[in-house]
Amino acid sequence: MTTTPDWVQDAIFYQIFPDRFARSAHNPNDLLTFESWDSPPNPHGFKGGDLYGVAERLDYLKDLGITALYLNPILASASNHRYHTFDYYNVDPLLGGNAAFRFLLDQAHKKNMRVILDGVFNHASRGFWQFHHVLENGTGSAYKDWFFFDPERLNGKKHWGAYPGPHEQKL
C-alpha cells in the first residue's frame, strides 16, 4: 500500500494550464502565431503561455499561500492542453522546453514550493512515432503490443466512445 507523503497533508495546490496562465518574454513565438491573450479561448488555438511565465509569477502564487503547483501536461504535443503526447522525453518547445522546466523547478524549490505533473501515459497522439511504426509495419513492429487495435479501424481504438481520439496504450 502506498502512503501519502506528509507534505501533502497541509499543501495548498494551484492547478495551472500552462498555455493559458502566463506568457513570458522568453516565449519562442517564432514557432507559432498565438491567439490574442484577450480573445476568447479556442480549443485548437494557442495563447502562448509558457513555463518561464509560470516561474515569473511564483512570488504572486506564494503570496496567495500556494505551496504546490499542479501542472497540466507539459510534454510535447500538437494540442494546447497537451493530453495528446507525441514525445514523452521532452517538454513542449512552445512551453520553453526542458530548460524552462528546469528553471521553473529550481525557482519553485527555492521558494519551498512543490511541482506535480499531470503525466499522461495511458494514451498517445497520432504523432507518437511508435504508433506510426505499428501502422507502417503491422505485426512486424516491435511496438505492436504497446497499443490496442480494433481491426475495423486501422487508426486505432475508440477513446471514451468517440472517434477519432488519442490512442490507448497498454501499460
Give names to the regions the model predicted.
Residues 2, 9-15:
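N-terminal basic, low-complexity leaders that serve as flexible interaction/assembly modules and, when applicable
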Residues 104-131:
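Hydrophobic or amphipathic alpha-helical targeting/insertion segments
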